[in-house]
Amino acid sequence: MRIETLDFSKFHVGTDAERYEFSTALLTGFANAGFIKLINHGFSQEEISQLFEENRRFFDLTDSIKAQIANEDGPKPQRGWSAVGAEKTGLLNTGGKTNLTKPDIEAPQDAKEHFDIGPSEDTEFPNKWPDNELIPGFQPWLESFYERSRYISFALMEALEIAMHLPKGAFIQKCQGHASELRLNHYPKITVKTLQGGKTSRIWPHTDFGVITLLAQDDVGGLEIQDKDNPTNFLPVSREDVSELVVNIGDTLERWTNGFLKAGLHQVTTPREIVNQSTETVRPRRSIAFFLKAHRQMSVGPLPQFVAEKTPAKYEDITALAYQQRRTAIVY
């Protein structure tokens, strides 16, 4: 299995033929691997580098300062800072199965902290920001990155509509509103021995809740995706270019397509080059993820186009917010 690298400019400014070629390649890449890489998407190398600098500036704040905008545990969209170990992703997809209730097992630990925001206009679940005097320019920079990421995500959904011969807006109209989220991740340095112990991982195998995810990652390594040709195996996904984005399918798109497209199971663990060196320390890792989400009151049950007598609905008809609440309740 391989991850295809697609040139977004072919869709954004290409001819009709190039747009269709990109669309079909996107669908094929998603169907084969659940993931693709995206280049020429509009973010320059300098802008992605600045994004990682904003990540560093935030997580360099003291825990006491970050705690002033801490996320409140519970079944709701996350906002603000979550400390190392607050989230328990090891409970989300035990045995590769997507859990909708918390399994009755001891939760393994996550060795990461993160900061989450939603849209600036969201009054139902408002954002929590550090004081601008402590980290000048942080909020407007992330708000701008959020909006541009949403634009790219909508364009990718338009491409899928084209490739799957769906009515215009079949996916995009369900994603309007105040639901998508942006997350900064920081994985502090950790020993290989700790990660090999089986009780702690940087992030455990899981699928994302939303429609699709755009991920920018640094060069530390450790991101791995499930090999669909050999589901017990995970394949490393290294960064080949500063500005590339890794794009994966989330639970919602799997549900909308009635399982035709499968959410991409992934994890962050010990980089392959030091996996057998138990005395080594894994460097801190940083990543930034944009999660395209459905409107909170939209159904995440299968679309009618994917349900037939021979392919009955595999997923229940519940709202996007109810689905997120079920999944979020598992990790806290």
From Swiss-Prot:
Query: Which pathway does the protein contribute to?
Result: Mycotoxin biosynthesis
Q: What is its EC number?
A: 1.14.-.-
Q: Which UniProt keywords apply?
A: Dioxygenase, Iron, Metal-binding, Oxidoreductase
Briefly explain the null phenotype: Abolishes pneumocandin A0 production, and 3S-hydroxyl-L-proline occupies the hexapeptide core's position 6, resulting in exclusive production of pneumocandin B0.
One GO biological process this protein is involved in is:
small molecule biosynthetic process
Look up the domain of life of the source: Eukaryota
Report domain Fe2OG dioxygenase positions.
Answer: 178-294
Instruction: List the SUPFAM superfamilies hit by this protein, alphabetically.
Output: Clavaminate synthase-like
Task: Spell out the molecular function terms from Gene Ontology.
Answer: dioxygenase activity; metal ion binding
User: What is the protein's applied use?
Assistant: Pneumocandin B0 is the starting molecule for the first semisynthetic echinocandin antifungal drug, caspofungin acetate. Pneumocandin B0 is a minor fermentation product, and its industrial production was achieved by a combination of extensive mutation and medium optimization. Inactivation of three of gloP/GLP450-1, gloO/GLP450-2, and gloM/GLOXY1 generates 13 different pneumocandin analogs that lack one, two, three, or four hydroxyl groups on 4R,5R-dihydroxy-ornithine and 3S,4S-dihydroxy-homotyrosine of the parent hexapeptide.
Q: Gene3D superfamilies this protein is in?
A: B-lactam Antibiotic, Isopenicillin N Synthase, Chain
CC cofactor: Fe(2+)
Q: How is the cofactor bound?
A: Binds 1 Fe(2+) ion per subunit.
Quick check: keyword Iron in the entry?
A: yes
Result when mutating T98I: Impairs the catalytic activity and abolishes 4S-methyl-L-proline and subsequent pneumocandin A0 production
Q: Where along the chain is 2-oxoglutarate bound? A: R285
- The residues listed in the UniProt record as binding Fe cation, with positions renumbered to this chain, are H206, D208, H266
> Quick check: keyword Cell inner membrane in the entry?
no
Family assignment? Belongs to the iron/ascorbate-dependent oxidoreductase family.
User: Its function?
Assistant: 2-oxoglutarate-dependent dioxygenase; part of the gene cluster that mediates the biosynthesis of pneumocandins, lipohexapeptides of the echinocandin family that prevent fungal cell wall formation by non-competitive inhibition of beta-1,3-glucan synthase. The 10,12-dimethylmyristoyl side chain is synthesized by the reducing polyketide synthase gloL/GLPKS4. The thioesterase gloN/GLHYD exclusively interacts with gloL/GLPKS4 to maintain turnover of the polyketide side chain.
- Protein's name in the database: 2-oxoglutarate-dependent dioxygenase gloC
Q: Which organism is it from?
A: Glarea lozoyensis (strain ATCC 20868 / MF5171)
